[in-house]
Amino acid sequence: MPVNMISKLLEKAVLPALDVAPPVKIGGPRRTSVLRNPNMEKLQKGYLFPEISIKREEHLKKYPDAKVISLGIGDTTEPIPSIVTSAMAEYALALSTPEGYQGYGPEQGHKNLRKEIADKVYPDMGIKESEVFISDGAQCDIARLQTLFGPNVTIAVQDPTFPGYVDNGVIMGQTGKADDGGRYAGIEYMRCAPENAFFPDLSRVRRTDVIFFCSPNNPTGHAASREQLRQLVELARRNGSIIVFDSAYSSYISSSSSSSTPRSIYEIPGAREVAIEVSSFSKFAGFTGVRLGWAVVPDELLYSDGVPVARDFDRVVCTCFNGASGIAQAGGVACLSTEEGRGAVARVVGVYRENARVLVETFRSLGKEVHGGGDAPYVWVRFPGRRSWDVFAEILEKTHVITVPGSGFGPGGEGFIRVSAFNSRDKVLEACQRLKSFLA
């Protein structure tokens, strides 16, 4: 019997039994019989920041000689301090010797870095090194936490907020479809606007299993007060919810305001029983390309059945992640372990903080309603009656300056743009001059 005839007979006999459709080819490329994850179809357009990169490339094709200045994506531009890069170089060089070579490290991270984070980032908060999980960045931790929670949890997010919380939830199957206004069914959107001082009315927030909360907030730049975070923790304790607190920008909270504006959720009594904190070396040490972050999962945080959340998160980390780069972790230790290292990264943060101040002054001088920029590297500017993408496009067209449309952070961002302080001082000053010429 010919081979092709045998194949056809096998398809008829086996495929129906497996309830699998055979590969198809209908006037185009051959397709597999694998069904697409239906949750991917729910996602709106592309992810925000790659979409902006596409707009930039289109603009440069139109204006090939344009000197584009990016005040868009939050990517650092200042060099990493030499005390940090020297530590990474020394670690990397040691890998070329028999004595210094190291392969896989602990999935949870090197013990010395976990201890430095517990001692230096969370002094007097009772955080143990065993509760710190080193990662390749806060955004990756958000995805791993969504894997941990699974598809059956309900989630709440600030509106506007970092889009990764929502998109990961959609991919995991935690939501329904988006309506015409961009709101996904099944997500509780906590409105954070100038009218409520960028903090939601918690008495009107529907109970959810997980609450994503970013402070200082990306994109609004608002840093929640101690009293506001006390209310948030109280809500979580009352409802039996888990807070995922994103403190990636906590180093931008000035020392003068730190007494009233916590840098960590664990400064609030009772938070250890209801909160996970994720953070990153990206924005305070310039590690956007190096990739290093961490999550804190306290021992006291338990599921409804009494199982520690940390036990399951450890399993997720061990299953999905082989640990952060040892070279990157050596840099993290250098950032925290000495006064010189801490001072060096603080000076870098100071550059961006001053850039934010210049941006705030520029927009205020133009009569614009401006928020943020004090305890965060982002400035949130309102353009009443305008659509965010239209404002973004007009500024790019007229000034060759890239911003971020506020609607990309959720429906509550419509009518705003986010302006980033992450660029060199010269370029920020040049961008401000262009904006003044256009908006005056």
UniProtKB/Swiss-Prot annotation:
Q: Which InterPro entries match?
A: Aminotransferase_I/II_large, DapL/ALD1, PyrdxlP-dep_Trfase, PyrdxlP-dep_Trfase_major, PyrdxlP-dep_Trfase_small
Q: What class of enzyme is it?
A: transferase
Kindly list the positions annotated as binding pyridoxal 5'-phosphate: 104, 218, 246, 249, 280, 282, 291
A GO molecular function for this record? pyridoxal phosphate binding
Q: Name one GO biological process term.
A: defense response
Q: Which UniProt keywords apply?
A: Aminotransferase, Plant defense, Pyridoxal phosphate, Transferase
Q: What is its EC number?
A: 2.6.1.-
Q: Which cofactor does it need?
A: pyridoxal 5'-phosphate
Question: Cross-referenced SUPFAM superfamilies, in alphabetical order?
Answer: PLP-dependent transferases
Functionally, this protein is described as follows: Probable aminotransferase that may generate amino-acid-derived defense signals and be involved in resistance to pathogens.
Family from the record: Belongs to the class-I pyridoxal-phosphate-dependent aminotransferase family. LL-diaminopimelate aminotransferase subfamily.
What name appears for this protein in its UniProt entry? Aminotransferase ALD1 homolog
Query: Species lineage, top-down?
Result: Eukaryota, Viridiplantae, Streptophyta, Embryophyta, Tracheophyta
Query: What's the gene?
Result: ALD1
